[in-house]
Every structure is written in C-alpha cells, then in structure tokens.
C-alpha cells in the first residue's frame, strides 16, 4: 500500500459496506451519530478508484472487504504509524469507524484495539489537588508559527523537556527560525545533546530511567509498574520532578519535593491493595475486568455514550475536511520518505551511538527507475530540505 493512502482504502471499505447492504444500520442508529455524513464522504471511493490510488489490485481490495464483512468476530488493531503523514488523522478516523459500520462490536474479540494504557483508570487528577490554572493552550504542532507569529502576547521563553521539537515537529525550517530568535530564551532539559539543544541558551542534564523513580504503564500491558533507580544520578543530572519542584519553589508556588517523595505522595492516593502491591512487588495488574467487550461492558466516553462518526469541529479544522484525502506525490517529488521507529535508538536516546550513514530502503522498482544500486550513496530531498 502506498504511504498515506490508508484513508482511501478505509473509505472504499465503507462504501462497499453501505452499497452492498452490509452496514449494520441497526447498530449505527442506536449507537452512533454522523453515519450518514460518513457515507456521503465515502461515496466517491469505489473499489477500483481506491485500489488505483493505493497501488493494490481491485481484486485484492474487494477480497479484503468481503472477508472483513463476513468474519465475526473481527478486530482491527490500529497502530500509530498510520497517522504519520498529512492524511494521518483522517486515516485513523476512517479506520476506527469500520467496526461500527460493519457491526463488529458487541462480541468478545470484535471491534478495535489501540491501547490498554488506561486499564487502571490512573489519572493525574487523583493526586493533583489544585485546579488547572486558566492559561493559554498552544498546539505543539504549531510551534514554528507560534514562535514567529504569535504576538498577543508573544512567546519569550521556551522550556523543552521530554521531546526534541527540531526533529519531530512539522515545518522544521520554521521551527528552527523561531528558535534562532535573539529575544527567545530557550532551556533544554534532556539526557542527550538533541538537535534542539543546539539552539538552547541553557542546557540542563536530565536523569535516565536508571537514575530515577517512575510509574510506567504501556500500550499493551494491563499493569502498572514502578521503576526504581539502580545507580546514583550521574554528574549534575536531575529528575523531572525535582527540577520542576525547584522551579515552583522559586516562583513561590509550592514546597520542594524529591523524586522519591513524589512517588510516595502519588501512590498514597491509590487504593490500598494497588499501593501495597506496587511498593512491595514493583507492579500491579488491573483490578478491573481486563477483557471488556466493547458496547457490552464499556462504551465511548462521549456525553451520550455514542460513537461520533462525523465531528463538525474536526471537519472545520481539517484542511480538506473530515475524511478528506491529499495526494502526497508531487510532480517534482513523487516518493514519500517514511521514518519509522528505529531499532537502534529510543527516540533521541542512544542516538549519539548510531553511525551517521543510515541505510535507506527502497522498493526495487523505484530504485531501478533512478539507477540506484545496493550500497550507493543517495541524496533524499524535497523543497524543504535534504539528507544524504
């Protein structure tokens, strides 16, 4: 499947289900809103049209549609990679709407799965007593325009932690121009010298998981784990809790708190059995039913408990509207570079140990068309930048 075309395939499946009377209209009527709007948006994507755009055969796509409609239970496991392109949000929406339209909810093993990280109902509201202050919220994906264009008021100070925006934020060139502002005071608090650290006025060393306490859940596990330090902090490195506690104290907001004290305070708000198991054994499994059936044991957390298949707000915000598709191939730049997670690093961690000459994988047909052979040095570029 060509990168960025997942939304087209999903919409073709929706059209197939509606057109062949395979949509579960009874379920949709009782448990969803906006199904008619979704159907309208999917109408343009026939099996043949979607297959041509996605680079698969019509017979392959139709066979998949038949299998999905026929099998019960049927589950969709949606990961995060599908959203990492300009059509990503619409793709995730279209894919996760399929179980509702096809009527795959209500049975064990049916529906969809993305993450079990909320299985323990573990929320910061359990230990944060003060109300959230009334402050301005800024979309982190708009960092470049925020740093350059916001003036009511403008951003004068940036504190970067747990992220590397120069490498991860959209519109990289604009982000870099913003970070180069002479009047912007930037602090980078990290474990390694990231791309963003090159633009910092001050760099503060952070501890790794080997040096600090933490509470950890995951996308797949039905458990909560406690991470304990196994070595002392190296050099001047400090954990997040202590740095922000010190900042709060200097601002007259709160008393200082160590990493261990914060852990004990947080666990004290938990039910006794969870707290005791966590502190004694280092992990605790979910005390709730870990195998819920969607639309039997659990329902959406929307105000009416229904699936919203067409959000008017998202439709207004999306550049091409909800379920819209943008052709990612341009005349001058017909290929798409995918940058998935690496088996050599964890985000920026260990990045300093990776050899600079990274391998590029290409489809043999694309490589042949460009005269590229194995072990050749290549230049990957578009109108915004390049990597060699």
Question: Over which residues does each language-model region extend?
Answer:
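Cofactor-binding active-site loop characterized by glycine-rich and histidine/acidic residues
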Residues: 124
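Non-catalytic terminal/interface segments that mediate subunit docking, oligomerization
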Residues: 98, 103-106, 305-352, 364-367
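Cofactor-pocket helix-loop regions in the catalytic cores of large enzyme subunits
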Residues: 1-112, 116, 127-297, 305, ...
């Amino acid at each position: 499947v060509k990168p960025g075309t997942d939304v087209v395939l999903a919409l073709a499946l929706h059209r197939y289900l509606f057109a062949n009377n395979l949509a579960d209209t009874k379920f949709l009527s009782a448990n969803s809103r906006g199904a008619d709007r979704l159907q309208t948006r999917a109408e343009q994507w026939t099996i043949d049209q979607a297959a041509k755009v996605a680079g698969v055969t019509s017979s392959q796509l139709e066979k998949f549609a038949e299998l999905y409609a026929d099998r019960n239970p049927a589950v969709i496991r949606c990961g995060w990679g599908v959203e990492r392109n300009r059509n990503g949000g619409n793709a995730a929406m279209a894919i996760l709407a399929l179980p509702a339209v096809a009527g795959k909810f209500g049975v064990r093993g049916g529906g969809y799965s993305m993450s079990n990280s909320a299985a323990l109902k573990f929320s910061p509201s359990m230990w944060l007593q003060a109300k959230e202050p009334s402050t301005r919220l800024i979309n982190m994906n708009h960092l470049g325009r925020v740093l350059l264009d916001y003036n009511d008021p403008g951003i004068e100070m940036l504190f970067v932690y747990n992220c590397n925006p120069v490498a991860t934020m959209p519109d990289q060139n604009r982000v870099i121009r913003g970070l180069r502002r002479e009047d912007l005071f930037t602090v980078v608090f990290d474990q390694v010298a990231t791309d963003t650290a090159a633009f910092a006025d001050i760099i503060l060393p952070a501890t790794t998981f080997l040096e600090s306490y933490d509470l950890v859940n995951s996308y797949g596990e039905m458990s909560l784990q406690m991470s304990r330090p196994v070595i002392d902090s190296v050099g001047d490195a400090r954990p997040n809790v202590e740095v922000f506690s010190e900042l709060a104290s200097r601002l007259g907001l709160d008393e200082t708190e160590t990493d261990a004290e914060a852990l004990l305070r947080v666990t004290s708000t938990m039910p006794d059995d969870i707290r005791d198991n966590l502190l004694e054994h280092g992990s605790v499994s979910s005390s709730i039913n870990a195998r819920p059936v969607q639309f039997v044991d659990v329902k959406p957390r929307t105000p009416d408990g229904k699936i919203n298949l067409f959000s008017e707000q998202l439709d207004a915000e999306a550049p091409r509207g909800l379920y819209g598709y943008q052709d990612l191939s341009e005349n001058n730049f017909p290929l798409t570079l995918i940058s998935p997670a690496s088996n050599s690093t964890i985000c920026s961690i260990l990045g300093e140990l990776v050899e600079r000459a990274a391998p590029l994988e290409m489809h043999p047909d694309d490589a042949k068309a460009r005269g590229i052979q194995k072990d050749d040095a290549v230049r990957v570029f578009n109108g915004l930048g390049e990597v060699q």
